[in-house]
């Protein structure tokens, strides 16, 4: 799937770094929910990086919890807008954290929303690439998080519209072209004409790309950064630095 052409729907005054601004402005009753969402979104890319740095699974889980807890605390105590791309900012913060006295901080309590360790390790095994650097593992995991969130939203929209079955049938072709004969085979399987499948796939791809852009918009500071971040996303998925 190639990067998407520029669109004007993104309002960066409302979407840029929205997760971080939520943490900064959260009142006490809202802090738990804000921290939970931060943890759920970015937990695994951080965990994958720490694991590739050579830490055992239990230690990597403790480091990830302590790091995200510290990030949330730092953001709530400052109203300054962190500069640049969230992906790069988070990695720089993580490297600084690992270079510091993280062992004392890792003794803190559990972050709400923390994924269970068996789930993290199952994903680590399934996504492991021999010889992959910590940074590339982080970037690839971050890209997969963005795509996964976009896909979940696409499925939800299709379900609300009563088209979940069609969406699931065409999902394998959102990022690649069908092989010769696959349209006809799928047409017979679900009872829809091939031309209707072609049109449905075109609409699903367009909406999927829009949703991915919306997810990326939450992690960058300006519209000018969108195309560069999309290129970085697909480069990470291709295994390029």
Question: Where would I find each of the regions flagged by the language model?
Answer:
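Intrinsic, short, N-terminal disordered tails of RNA polymerase sigma-factor systems
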Residues: 1-241
């Amino acid at each position: 799937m190639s990067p998407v052409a520029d669109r004007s729907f993104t309002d960066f005054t409302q979407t840029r770094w929205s997760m971080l601004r939520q943490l900064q402005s959260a009142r006490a009753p809202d802090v738990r929910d804000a921290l939970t969402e931060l943890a759920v979104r970015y937990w695994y890319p951080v965990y994958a990086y720490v694991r590739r740095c050579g830490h055992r699974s239990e230690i990597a889980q403790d480091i990830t919890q302590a790091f995200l807890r510290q990030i949330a605390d730092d953001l709530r105590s400052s109203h300054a807008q962190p500069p640049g791309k969230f992906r790069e900012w988070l990695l720089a913060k993580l490297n600084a954290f690992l270079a510091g006295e993280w062992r004392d901080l890792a003794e803190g309590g559990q972050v709400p929303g923390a994924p269970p360790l068996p789930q993290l390790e199952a994903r680590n095994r399934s996504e492991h690439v021999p010889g992959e650097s910590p940074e590339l593992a982080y970037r690839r995991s971050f890209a997969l998080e963005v795509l996964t969130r976009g896909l979940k939203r696409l499925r939800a929209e299709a379900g609300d519209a009563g088209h979940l079955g069609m969406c699931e049938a065409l999902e394998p072709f959102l990022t690649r072209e069908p092989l010769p004969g696959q349209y006809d085979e799928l047409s017979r399987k679900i009872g829809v004409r091939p031309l209707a499948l072609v049109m449905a796939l075109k609409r699903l791809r367009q909406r999927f790309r829009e949703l991915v852009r919306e997810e990326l918009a939450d992690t960058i500071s300006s519209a000018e950064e969108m195309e560069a971040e999309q290129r970085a996303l697909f480069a990470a998925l291709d295994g390029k630095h």
